[in-house]
């Protein structure tokens, strides 16, 4: 896993806040995303993870705050040239087969054709290429969405719940695929609620609770912070660290 160097931050999120009526979904959220890393956004259901992804991607307008790319503020429209967002639970072009969806996406986004066959093999999509998207199981659809993301040309890939719908073996294979396709000029930002999966694939973590960032850092940094806050030693398991900090 890569080491974190603050000087290598490719994206900086500064003071993002978002409310829906009287409900504060995000409250002064700030963190950095570094080039060539897998950053995990970790939080319980309802913590604001999806809202944060949508605001960072420019799909939702934040009430205040800014997103910087290489120290330059970037508005919502221009973010699409830098960020590619893969939402959870969507069914793109449901009547079309997997092969059509991937080929169309490659052409529309000017995607990474050089890794097309490798991504298909890594995500075991070959048997599904002629199957309509609507006929896929939840796990099969998730693997197709992961392929769409990996083939996108943007340097920063945001994936909401990359392991949702996958069994244990598939989750491990998906994590290995993400790690395999991580390059020095590419960054993956993953929203995950499965703590065990996050600990295995991510280099650093942003912990979100109640719409606020409660901690950010590598696992050893978060473990030390959790022990300091708890006032006593804690097991090394990420689950215990997460519970202590949130």
Question: Which functions belong to the PLM regions below?
Answer:
Residues 42-44:
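The feature captures the beta-strand-to-loop junction immediately N-terminal to the Walker
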Residues 57:
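Helix-to-loop junction immediately C-terminal to a conserved catalytic motif
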Residues 65-79:
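Conserved ABC transporter NBD signature motif
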Residues 103, 113-129:
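Conserved ABC ATPase "signature" region
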Residues 146:
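Hydrophobic anchor residue at the start of the ABC signature
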Residues 157-161:
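Catalytic Walker B motif of ABC-type/P-loop ATPase nucleotide-binding domains
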């Amino acid at each position: 896993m890569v080491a974190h160097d603050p000087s290598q931050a490719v994206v900086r999120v500064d003071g993002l806040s978002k409310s829906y009526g009287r409900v504060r979904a995000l409250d002064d959220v700030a963190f950095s995303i570094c080039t060539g890393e897998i950053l995990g956004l970790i939080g319980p259901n309802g913590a604001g993870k999806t809202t944060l992804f949508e605001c960072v991607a420019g799909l939702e307008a934040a009430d205040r705050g800014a997103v910087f790319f290489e120290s330059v503020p970037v508005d919502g429209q221009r973010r699409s040239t830098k960020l590619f967002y893969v939402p959870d639970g969507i069914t793109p072009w449901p009547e079309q087969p997997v092969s059509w969806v991937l080929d169309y996406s490659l052409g529309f986004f000017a995607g990474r054709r050089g890794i097309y066959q490798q991504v298909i093999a890594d995500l075991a999509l070959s048997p599904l290429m002629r199957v309509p998207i609507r006929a896929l199981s939840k796990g099969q659809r998730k693997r197709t969405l992961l392929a769409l993301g990996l083939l996108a040309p943007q340097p920063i890939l945001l994936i909401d719940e990359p392991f949702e719908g996958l069994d244990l073996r598939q989750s491990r294979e998906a994590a290995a695929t993400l790690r395999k396709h991580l390059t020095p000029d590419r960054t993956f930002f993953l929203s995950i609620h499965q703590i065990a999966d996050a600990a295995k694939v991510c280099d650093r973590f942003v912990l979100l609770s109640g719409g606020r960032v409660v901690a950010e850092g590598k696992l050893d940094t978060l473990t030390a912070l959790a022990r300091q806050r708890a006032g006593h030693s804690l097991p090394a398991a990420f689950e215990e660290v997460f519970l202590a900090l949130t």
